[in-house]
């Protein structure tokens, strides 16, 4: 996974990624607010009332999340093709048009594709793409992926977030867990490959980075 994160930003020709990803996330208006472009809006979990008019500041961004969303949807399509091909394979075997070893190979590929899809989706759904904090610093908005590879916003109270200084996480690791006292959600962010855009607001939520690096 770390190799994939290093490779994504080095891919030549950003236009090659931009074309299939233009319907993912794009900037709307001024500032760092991100809106969904497409036929439907992304679902939000437990969206507090009044957030439509509240101003949010971007404090963290992981640019490779767009490529991972595209990869997730590509993997979903590939898995669907392999699974759909199984019934015709069984029919061909029953008619003597396919050997048992070929059918077993096809079934193995489909099973492996399903396992990989479940693993990738489980991780990608918890990988943070963008973090926002409202003006008063009381509400955290987490932009991450759904099972289908589309964007989803989850709202968390800042008071419910466990600071990294109180957790056993090492900020030097590739992925760092961010958890809630209530245990509702667990997300992962990468301080190594992501960018902290507002250190002051980030520190108000997760603790001062200088202190964290010295304590780990």
Curated annotation (Swiss-Prot):
The keyword Transmembrane helix applies. Residues 1-68, 125-216 are mitochondrial matrix. The keyword Transmembrane helix applies. Residues 92-103 are mitochondrial intermembrane. InterPro entries: Tmem186. Its main location: mitochondrion. It is found in: Mitochondrion inner membrane. It is a multi-pass membrane protein. Signal peptide: none annotated. As part of the MCIA complex, required for efficient assembly of the mitochondrial complex I. Belongs to the TMEM186 family. Part of the mitochondrial complex I assembly/MCIA complex that comprises at least the core subunits TMEM126B, NDUFAF1, ECSIT and ACAD9 and complement subunits such as COA1 and TMEM186. Interacts with MT-ND3. This is Transmembrane protein 186. It comes from Rattus norvegicus.
């Amino acid at each position: 996974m770390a190799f994939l994160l290093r490779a994504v930003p080095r891919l030549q020709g950003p236009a090659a990624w931009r074309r299939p990803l233009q319907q993912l996330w794009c900037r709307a208006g001024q500032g760092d607010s991100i809106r969904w472009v497409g036929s439907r809006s992304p679902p939000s979990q437990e969206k507090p009332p009044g957030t439509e008019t509240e101003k949010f500041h971007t404090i963290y961004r992981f640019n490779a999340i767009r490529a991972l969303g595209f990869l997730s949807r590509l993997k979903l399509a590939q898995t669907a093709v392999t699974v759909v091909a199984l019934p015709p394979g069984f029919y061909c075997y029953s008619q003597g048009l396919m050997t048992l070893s070929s059918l077993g190979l096809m079934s193995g590929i489909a099973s492996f594709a399903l396992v990989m899809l479940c693993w990738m989706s489980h991780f990608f759904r918890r990988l943070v793409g963008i973090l926002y904090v409202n003006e008063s610093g009381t509400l955290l908005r987490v932009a991450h992926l759904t099972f289908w590879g589309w964007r989803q916003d989850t709202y968390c109270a800042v008071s419910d977030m466990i600071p990294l200084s109180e957790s056993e996480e090492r900020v030097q690791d590739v992925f760092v867990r961010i958890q809630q006292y209530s245990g509702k959600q667990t997300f992962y962010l990468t301080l190594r490959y992501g960018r902290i855009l507002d250190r002051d607001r980030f520190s108000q939520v997760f603790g001062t980075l200088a202190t964290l690096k010295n304590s780990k």
